[in-house]
Amino acid sequence: MTKTIAVTNQKGGVGKTTTTINLASALGQEGKKVLLIDLDPQANATVGSGIDRAGLSFTVYQMLLERCSLAETIVSSESGFDVLPAEAGLAGAQVELTGEDEGDNYKLKAALETATHYDFVLIDCPPALNVLTLNALVAADSYLIPVQCEYYALEGLAGLEDTIRRIKDSING
């Protein structure tokens, strides 16, 4: 069974992307089948995984808008894991998906139903609580929340934990 982990925090610069790439690489070196999903419009996880954005036919942006399938979007990295790449245009998905209907938050979860051959799916989230992050939280069964060792970071962590709990309650309930 695939384990889906969202690496998330509403704050930027806390190590989400670095954690996601390093975890994907370590799991890949252990022989696990890993899919890294880059949901951040900055696309740092894509670039950091060695993927040339210029040569991409599709990205997670087109997949979320159902213009292509998950399989058409996945690219293999030289680091031993697959990548669902991002691009700057992904910021547009926030506009195109937000406010449409509640199903917009389930698009990633639905797409991942075809990714059962992976041992792990790791989702690098943007530093915001938006439709992209909500898609990750809905799709994930576990969460890694990197935080800085400071008071305000812990306050933000409590808020994020509450958001995750409410999302899971609405999915299961």
Which role fits each region the language model picked out?
Residues M1-G173:
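P-loop NTP-binding core
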